[in-house]
Regions:
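C-terminal motif of bacterial Sec signal peptides marking the signal peptidase cleavage site
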Residues: 8-11
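Sec-dependent N-terminal signal peptides
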Residues: 1-3
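Extracytoplasmic/secreted proteins, especially bacterial periplasmic and envelope-associated proteins
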Residues: 17, 21, 25, 88, ...
């Protein structure tokens, strides 16, 4: 029993440290962080366990046909409470991207353990630290 509790605690600590590192990297890059109750990806979830749902946004300046414009890009970071929730969320991200985004939007999804990210590739790269 002690081993199970220790393993659970270690897992929670790793996720917590990972969450702090992700938030720090995004903030250092000029992105904003907000905690959400739901996301476009998780709004249909029933019976799944989510710990934190984070929406990160950052304004990018783009030049199209000589005109500069500001575009706000976003990244959703979903901390799942168990493997079944992470599996469901990973599939929900893929479905969301297929239904709502095109290749030109440059949105991707990524999963690490029980953390699932879905959003603009540059923000996701910052969050993943590469």
């Amino acid at each position: 029993m002690v081993c199970v509790l220790l393993a659970s605690l270690t897992s929670c600590m790793k996720i917590g440290m990972k969450q702090n590192a992700i938030e720090s990297r995004l903030k250092e890059s000029g992105a904003t962080i907000s905690y959400e109750r739901t996301t476009p990806i998780t709004k249909e979830a029933k019976g799944y366990v989510f710990e934190d749902l984070i929406r990160s946004t950052k304004v990018y300046t783009r030049t199209v046909d000589g005109q500069e414009s500001e575009v706000t890009e976003e990244l959703f970071i979903i901390f799942c409470g168990n493997d079944a929730t992470a599996d469901w969320t990973e599939n929900a991200c893929k479905t969301y991207l297929a239904d709502n985004k095109s290749d030109s939007d440059k949105w991707i999804s990524y999963r690490y353990d029980r953390i699932v990210m879905c959003g603009y590739y540059e923000l996701l790269s910052i969050a993943r630290n590469y």
